[in-house]
Curated annotation (Swiss-Prot):
Source organism, top-level taxon: Bacteria
Keyword presence, Transmembrane: no
Molecular function per GO: structural constituent of ribosome
Chain positions covered by the region annotation Disordered: 30-78
Protein name as it appears in the record: Small ribosomal subunit protein bS21A
Keywords: Ribonucleoprotein, Ribosomal protein
Disulphide-bonded residues: none
GO biological process: translation
Organism: Rhizobium etli (strain ATCC 51251 / DSM 11541 / JCM 21823 / NBRC 15573 / CFN 42)
Cited NCBIfam families: S21p
Pfam families: Ribosomal_S21 (PF01165)
Biased amino acid composition, Basic residues: 53-62
Length: 78
């Protein structure tokens, strides 16, 4: 994975690198490989992730149809 450092701006390059790694799922992969996960635990985790995905899709569908109010946008304090 490559990141260009422009004008010696290392902070920006690190942010870009971190964002790329996040998109590629590298942090999740490193966490998963840090310790052995039993096959039964893996199945349970994957099943839980699938349930969360389905709930999220159902919630979004209800919001699109107008049966649920849309979530409120968080206002940042500056």
């Amino acid at each position: 994975m490559q990141v260009l450092v422009r004008d010696n701006n290392v902070d920006q390059a690190l942010r870009v690198l971190k964002k790329k790694m996040q998109r590629e799922g590298l942090f999740r992969e490193m966490k998963a490989r840090s310790a052995y996960e039993k096959p039964s635990e893996k199945r349970a985790r994957e099943k839980g992730e699938a349930v969360r995905r389905q709930r999220k899709l159902a919630r979004k569908k209800l919001q699109r149809e107008g049966l649920l109010p849309a979530p409120k946008k968080a206002v940042r304090a500056r």
